[in-house]
Amino acid sequence: MHDVIIVYWRDIPAQVIVGKGRRATKIQLPERFEQAIDRAAMKSDQKSTDDYLAEWRKAKPFKVKGNPEDIAREQAEKLEIEYDKEKLIVLVNNNGRAD
């Protein structure tokens, strides 16, 4: 069993991490997620780099069986489907927050 952690800026996912430490498998989500984060950060008028960095968080880990590379890829694909263009637009318009 491997720990899976999703990294978010506010409520917008950015990265999938499977495992721990230097040997962890990491997958950056596609550029559209990075662009959504940038737009939401600019829209929310972050005052400093520290304010921006303070909004990054790791979700609570969950366990999955299998090959770490496969797990990371599958989790990234799930996020790509769940966070379609429309959902990212809603998040951007709400300053990166789901509620």
Language-model-detected regions and their locations in the chain:
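Short, charged/polar N-terminal "headpieces" of proteins
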Residues: 1-27
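Charged, low-complexity, helix-prone segments enriched in Lys/Glu/Asp/Gln
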Residues: 3, 7, 35-43, 72
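A general marker of short, structured functional hotspots
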Residues: 4-5, 29, 48, 79
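Residue-level marker of positions within ordered structural domains that often coincide
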Residues: 16, 38, 84
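Acidic, aromatic-enriched beta-alpha/helix-loop junctions
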Residues: 21-58
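Acidic, low-complexity intrinsically disordered segments
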Residues: 48-99
